Amino acid sequence: DLLTAIKRVKESMKRRT
């Protein structure tokens, strides 16, 4: 789903600091 992909991408960006 697009929401799932966006959620994963958002989490990945947040961990990048």
UniProtKB/Swiss-Prot annotation:
Compartmental location: Secreted
Query: Mind telling me which GO cellular component terms the entry cites?
Result: extracellular region
Q: Does the keyword Secreted apply?
A: yes
Tell whether Secreted is among the UniProt keywords: yes
Chief place where the protein resides: secreted
Q: Which family does it belong to?
A: Belongs to the cationic peptide 04 (cupiennin) family. 07 subfamily.
Protein name (record): Cupiennin-7b
Origin species: Cupiennius salei (American wandering spider)
Molecular-function GO terms, alphabetical: toxin activity
Its keywords, alphabetically, are:
Amidation, Secreted, Toxin
Give residues where Threonine amide occurs: 17
